[in-house]
Amino acid sequence: MAFLKKSLFLVLFLGLVSLSICDEEKRQDEDDDDDDDEEKRGVFDIIKDAGKQLVAHATGKIAEKV
């Protein structure tokens, strides 16, 4: 009976260790993905701001002609 308990505890311990390692790798992968998303947002913000300035400049030119 003691042998079965020790074996069971060993299996559970090794399972918990492997789960924690997998969780750490998953968090690292998610952090890497977050960095990519931030870069994409940064580029989109630059394009959006340039578009706003272009529209403002164009509407200013149209208002001057009228």
UniProtKB/Swiss-Prot annotation:
Top-level taxon: Eukaryota
GO BP field: defense response; symbiont-mediated hemolysis of host erythrocyte
InterPro entries to which the protein is assigned, alphabetical: Antimicrobial15 (IPR012518), Frog_antimicrobial_propeptide (IPR004275), FSAP (IPR016322)
Cellular localization per UniProt: Secreted
GO cellular component, one term: extracellular region
Residues the record lists as Valine amide modifications: V66
Keywords of this entry: Amidation, Amphibian defense peptide, Cleavage on pair of basic residues, Secreted, Signal
UniProt note on tissues of expression: Expressed by the skin glands.
Signal peptide bounds: 1-22
Residue ranges of the propeptide: 23-39
Primary location class: secreted
Keyword Protein transport among UniProt keywords: no
Protein family: Belongs to the frog skin active peptide (FSAP) family. Ocellatin subfamily.
Function: Has no antibacterial activity against Gram-negative bacteria E.coli ATCC 25922, S.pneumoniae ATCC 700603 and S.choleraesuis ATCC 14028 or against Gram-positive bacterium S.aureus ATCC 29313. Shows no hemolytic activity and no cytotoxicity.
Name of the molecule in the record: Ocellatin-PT2
Source species of the chain: Leptodactylus pustulatus
The organism's taxonomic lineage, starting at the top: Eukaryota, Metazoa, Chordata, Craniata, Vertebrata
